[in-house]
UniProtKB/Swiss-Prot annotation:
PANTHER family: COBALT TRANSPORT PROTEIN CBIM, PTHR43627. GO terms for biological process: cobalamin biosynthetic process. Residues 1-33 form the signal peptide. It comes from Thermosynechococcus vestitus (strain NIES-2133 / IAM M-273 / BP-1). Forms an energy-coupling factor (ECF) transporter complex composed of an ATP-binding protein (A component, CbiO), a transmembrane protein (T component, CbiQ) and 2 possible substrate-capture proteins (S components, CbiM and CbiN) of unknown stoichimetry. It is found in: Cell inner membrane. Belongs to the CbiM family. This is Cobalt transport protein CbiM.
Length: 257
């Protein structure tokens, strides 16, 4: 039997996930994003990135199955991590290129559930965005997922583990993980575009520098903002979901209040 306090926490988590998702889906504003748009990549590159991504997706599906099988109580936290990534990556500001830039929101889930599982959540986020709010596309889903749902989570996790070894406060490790995952994701996106469209004069290096410079104008401030937001959300989780985090052993006991 679920205790009233547990029921309250579950209801709170479910309400946050439902409310934040509905706010984005119901938004009437047109959505432009720095995900690679539908049909933008040449066919060879689109197929190539799909082939590179599929093994990580298969690994993620297995990881998700194991997570739910071993820790069924974590389903709502998994849903919350997915909803958080969906909402945060749907927040957009104009970029100097005439498109928009946005954070990725993938670091929190990577820290909670490890990078393989985030390949599934990140792909679902990108799929819903491409179908519901015109972010990205289906042909470019492989490239977008490889950068946001594979490279982003692994960078977040490795950064978090590395910074945590310095025995700093968890907030610093969380901020660093979120910041690096953002910058790394869009660095790879810049490389993907540069590989597909090398500069006619300077080649790959010049094209990469151009894309990276344009992305950095808006992405670095957004990476800082997401890092701060991730810390705030983590503080909320360690206040209202202490029992769940302890039961799942998602983080060392001493990092919980």
């Amino acid at each position: 039997m679920v205790k009233p306090t547990q029921a309250k926490r579950y209801a709170s988590l479910g309400a946050i996930a439902l409310l934040t998702t509905s706010l984005v889906v119901a938004s009437p504003n047109p959505a432009l994003a720095m995900h690679i748009s539908e049909g933008f990549l040449p066919l060879g590159w689109a197929v190539g990135w799909w082939l590179a991504f599929l093994p990580f997706l298969a690994w993620g599906l297995w990881s998700l199955q194991q997570q739910i099988k071993q820790h069924s109580e974590s389903v709502l936290l998994v849903a919350l991590a997915g909803a958080y990534a969906f909402v945060v990556s749907s927040l957009k500001i104009p970029s100097v290129t005439g498109s928009c830039s946005h954070p990725i929101g993938i670091a929190l889930g990577a820290i909670l559930f490890r990078p393989p599982l985030m390949a599934v959540l990140g792909t679902l986020v990108l799929l819903f965005q491409s179908l519901l709010i015109a972010h990205g596309g289906l042909t470019t889903l492989g490239a977008n997922a490889f950068s946001m749902a594979v490279v982003g989570p692994w960078l977040a996790w490795l950064t978090y583990c590395g910074v945590s070894r310095l025995r700093v406060k968890p907030a610093i490790a969380l901020f660093a993980a979120s910041f690096i995952s953002n910058v790394g994701t869009y660095t790879l996106t810049s490389l993907q575009l540069a590989l597909a469209f090398p500069d006619s004069v300077g080649g790959l290096a010049t094209s990469f520098a151009k894309f990276g410079t344009l992305f950095a104008v808006t992405q670095i401030p957004l990476a800082i903002s997401e890092g701060l937001l991730t810390v705030l959300v983590w503080n909320w989780l360690t206040t209202y979901c202490v029992a769940e985090l302890q039961a799942l052993r998602l983080l060392p006991q001493e990092e919980l209040p």
